[in-house]
Structure formats: structure tokens, C-alpha cells
């Protein structure tokens, strides 16, 4: 079977499946984080992708609604839960995603109670040569955040991107991306500003780069990031570089993280590109 695409809205997915059924092509929907559409007969893949492109251009075309009526239903057959927001929070994140979020929250609480400096002495990038063998410091800087907006912004993106990677590609892949990007983005940032920095944003930018390029080069992976969001990420880097908003940003970590994510996605999709 071949995965054709994913839709966030299950009714939209059902409309496309119903239409293709009227064209003699049988597709199935599998529910994960989104509604994934699968094709059993891979010889029809080009035809389905062509119809998909037309569907995306104008999903409200009357022929698609007519197809749903012709198939005998106009709903997706899904049962909606009373608390879809809470269900979405749980379903979009795996154990690694939640563990990192919990660690960030606990460290933030500790920083609020006993002070930033006290926590940074234990978790910051090695600020003295005698600390270089305290290996955890090369990674624990990602758990420190210095304002409520800082932690909320980073955790939202971490949940959205990290959760998707973990659900689709496994906890191991998310751990590898996190460890490598934390190490390299931290190294670059300490060259820019010294060891007193913190935040998950370097890892978040790595995930942005990874998810976007992986989706572009290997759509069958089931992960993707809208191009508008990657453009937003680039504009945010530019804004931070030129200090447009007067905010202290870890520009080195952002740039390094993005490059790490793009590089990892490129390597991971080499075989996928060869298959096509």
C-alpha cells in the first residue's frame, strides 16, 4: 500500500475518498494524528495524485459533495469526543515528547522558586574548563527558560513538531534529533554569547528544518510542515539577528539548529529519493 496524503480534517479526507470511489479508485483512510489516505493499487498512484492536486485547488467543488451523496454518505463515520482538545494533546505526543515537556516545566518552576542563577550553575553549558567533563551540561541547557512566553512558545512548537516526529518515525528518531541539535546548537550559541543561555529553541528549529525537508523529499514519511511556517521561521531568525523587537534571542542556536535539521532530513531521505 502507498500513502497518498494526510488531511487534518477527516471530512475533507472522506470527501476525496468518496470522489475517487466514483472514479473507480479505492482508497482507505487510517486515523493517526491526521486522516491518512492509502492506495492499495500503486499502479494508479499518478492518477490519484493528479486528482488530489485538483481537489486541493478547489475542495468545495460541487462534484465532490455529489460524490459523497453517490457513495451513500456525507459524513466521515467518525465519533467525535467531548474534549477534542485534550484528546489531541494526548494523541499527538509520545513519551519522549512528554518527558521533555515535563522536564522544561519542572526546571522553569525551580528557576522561579530558587532563582535563575542557582539553576544555571548546575545546568548551563560548561562555563569553566573544570566543568567540561560534566557531560550533561552539553544538553541540559535546553530545559532552561527565562520567561513564561519563552517556555510556552517553545513547548508549543516542540509538542507540534516533536510529537509528529515521534508518532510517525519513532521515539528513537526524536531522541537522535534532540541530542544532536542540542549539542551543536549549544556549541554555536556559546561561541556567540558565552555559556549563559538556555531554551529549547535550537532543537525546535532543528525539528522545523527536519520536518519541512523530510516532507518535501519523502512525502510517504507522513510528516510535513507548511511552507508558510518555514518562511515564518526564517523571518523570525532575521528579526532576531537584527534585533527588530528588542528581544534577546539565541540567534546562533536558531541558525545552527535549522541547519542541523535540514542536514539530517537530507541524509535520511537519500534512499527515498533514489526509490523515486
UniProtKB/Swiss-Prot annotation:
GO terms for cellular component: plasma membrane. It holds the Pfam family Rhomboid_N. Its EC number is 3.4.21.105. The keyword S-adenosyl-L-methionine does not apply. GO terms for molecular function: serine-type endopeptidase activity. SUPFAM superfamilies: Rhomboid-like (SSF144091). Belongs to the peptidase S54 family. This is Rhomboid protease GlpG. It comes from Salmonella typhimurium (strain LT2 / SGSC1412 / ATCC 700720).
Amino acid at each position: 500500500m502507498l500513502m497518498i496524503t494526510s488531511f487534518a480534517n477527516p471530512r475533507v479526507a472522506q470527501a476525496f475518498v468518496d470522489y475517487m470511489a466514483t472514479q473507480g479508485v479505492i482508497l482507505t483512510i487510517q486515523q493517526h494524528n491526521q486522516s491518512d489516505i492509502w492506495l492499495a493499487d500503486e499502479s494508479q498512484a499518478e492518477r490519484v495524485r493528479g486528482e488530489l492536486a485538483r481537489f486541493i485547488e478547489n475542495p468545495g467543488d460541487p462534484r465532490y459533495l455529489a460524490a459523497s451523496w453517490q457513495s451513500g454518505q456525507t459524513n466521515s463515520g467518525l465519533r467525535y469526543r467531548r474534549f477534542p482538545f485534550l484528546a489531541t494533546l494526548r494523541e499527538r505526543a509520545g513519551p519522549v515528547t512528554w518527558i521533555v515537556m515535563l522536564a522544561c516545566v519542572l526546571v522553569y518552576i525551580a528557576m522561579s522558586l530558587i532563582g535563575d542563577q542557582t539553576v544555571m550553575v548546575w545546568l548551563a553549558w560548561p562555563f569553566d574548563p573544570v566543568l567540561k567533563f560534566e557531560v550533561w551540561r552539553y544538553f541540559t541547557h535546553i530545559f532552561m527558560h527565562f520567561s513564561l512566553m519563552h517556555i510556552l512558545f517553545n513547548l508549543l512548537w516542540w509538542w507540534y513538531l516533536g510529537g509528529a516526529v515521534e508518532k510517525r518515525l519513532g521515539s528513537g528518531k526524536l531522541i537522535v534529533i534532540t541530542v544532536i541539535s542540542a549539542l551543536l546548537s549549544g556549541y554555536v550559541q556559546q561561541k556567540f554569547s558565552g555559556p549563559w543561555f538556555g531554551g529549547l529553541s535550537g532543537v525546535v528549529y532543528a525539528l522545523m528544518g527536519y520536518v519541512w525537508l523530510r516532507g518535501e523529499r519523502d512525502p510517504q514519511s507522513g510528516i510535513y510542515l507548511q511552507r508558510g511556517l518555514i518562511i515564518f521561521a526564517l523571518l523570525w531568525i532575521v528579526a532576531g539577528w537584527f534585533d527588530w523587537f528588542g528581544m534577546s534571542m539565541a540567534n546562533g542556536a536558531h541558525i545552527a539548529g535549522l541547519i542541523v535539521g535540514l542536514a539530517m532530513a537530507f541524509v535520511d531521505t537519500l534512499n527515498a529519493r533514489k526509490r523515486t
